[in-house]
């Protein structure tokens, strides 16, 4: 028998305030509410500190509302760790018990489009979407009171300043293959392939400035990070990605990589530190630096594009630029989106009536959704680059809680969980038992269609260039066969290039991708600068030192382009070295002379190399 326990007595007063200073900033037009918690527990059951599911009744705009919350069991991995440093520099790592945490996702009753991301640690703090509008809620700091302030995000006073920007300068329109892909809708086949979740095991590093900003209090920093990741996890559910926090590192005794006003230098230094240090002691897929520094210009974040799983470049940096955790979480979602192959949205990209996550500028309008372009770019990235690290599911923390069939969470003993039989949209799953139907051959994969292997000979990976080979399903597997391509060194593009790992790299295409149309390969004289061995010209790096090119290798160092676009006249244009150093160099495999191609900063013979 289930009894309903009224934990507190409803005392909702429709009090309207005109202005108040809250944790989220200066707020105009807020409402004071007293939420009532209603818990359904089996008779005689001991109430845990933080239940797996809760509901609250409150009034918003004078209308009753029921907020349903469910603990975010995807928030932490079982091997979650926290690291900080003693005043004498000693590394201190702990493995706290995080099963009984207080971070929830939820929805509003009778509002199918509603969402919520809430911390219930000390009252209710977070945001929820009601009838298409974002509301923030936080407890008022009144002694012996359950009073909370509820207010629309639009009523938070905005700073009178220039728009906040992402530091990535590459625009969506410059990528022709992705531009074409964005003109498509998300097909049923793509949806089937995306349906199985990917898993990003995330480490967040809070720099020394964050430690100082939050009163040198480790608990305050942790709480802020947990709130951000809870929202980040909610945002990425729309891309079928689960973000699990596997580690939090706080640089309490000083920064371990260079954190400067230059976002480019900060990102590069952080990536080097991750590769050299963090990866050796903590298994993870992606690391984000959360910093209190105010980067030069309007930049609030930066990341490398399409480098998830890379030891150095699977990183991002995010400025802690707002007292509203939603806005910082959106910025982190944006930068991680770059790691996952997403570019800034162009004019034709849309996510309904909202500003989209991958907009280059952080809008004063709320943004929690990815655009149609982002969906297609993510699909293209997964299918082309197949980043293996995000396929493994993190160790789960919910081993204490018994599985509940129908809650849309895949738990111990379940093969699938698509919700109630009435709401289940996943035909492979028997919603009544949370087991796969007996006739199911596969659940996911490019060669899986309606839970069956696709017919042998069905193309599953189109060739991306004349150097590539199209692959077809075997009829015996859900996976597309290993990507194969024509032999390296084979002439391509009318002898302007040579095949290299399935592509035909030529300098013109690289210049076009970096700078747009009307930009071409520079004259040979520009490449002579690569003999200098400085920021403007070199062939490779050895232990951080820029090595000058030998005369015969000058076209295998820094890339020089001739920019004839309107308003420009730069015959020897180079890509800024502080933005993304591997983009400033001539790509491996590029033709550097007749019968020769570039490799590791040298121009070598095709015949002998292959």
UniProtKB/Swiss-Prot annotation:
Motif position, D/ECD-tripeptide: 466-468
Domain Disintegrin: 402-488
Glycosylation sites: 217
Function: Snake venom metalloproteinase that impairs hemostasis in the envenomed animal.
Misc: The disintegrin domain belongs to the long disintegrin subfamily.
Domain called Peptidase M12B: residue spans: 198-394
Chief location: secreted
Secretion signal span: 1-19
CDD domains, A to Z: ZnMc_adamalysin_II_like
Superkingdom of origin organism: Eukaryota
Cellular compartment(s): Secreted
Disulfide bridge positions per record: 309-389, 349-373, 351-356, 405-434, 416-429, 418-424, 428-451, 442-448, 447-473, 460-480, 467-499, 492-504, 511-561, 526-572, 539-549, 556-598, 592-603
Propeptide feature: residues: 20-188
Enzyme class: hydrolase
Pfam families reported in the protein's UniProt record: ADAM_CR, Disintegrin, Pep_M12B_propep, Reprolysin
Record lineage: Eukaryota, Metazoa, Chordata, Craniata, Vertebrata
EC id: 3.4.24.-
Organism of provenance: Crotalus adamanteus (Eastern diamondback rattlesnake)
Name this polypeptide is given: Zinc metalloproteinase-disintegrin-like 3a
Cofactor section: Zn(2+)
Positions annotated to bind Ca(2+) 1: 201, 285, 389, 392
Entry's cofactor comment: Binds 1 zinc ion per subunit.
A GO MF label: metal ion binding
Residue numbers binding Zn(2+): 334, 338, 344
GO BP field: proteolysis
One GO cellular component term noted in the UniProt record for this chain: plasma membrane
UniProt entry keywords in alphabetical sequence: Calcium, Cell adhesion impairing toxin, Disulfide bond, Glycoprotein, Hemostasis impairing toxin, Hydrolase, Metal-binding, Metalloprotease, Protease, Secreted, Signal, Toxin, Zinc, Zymogen
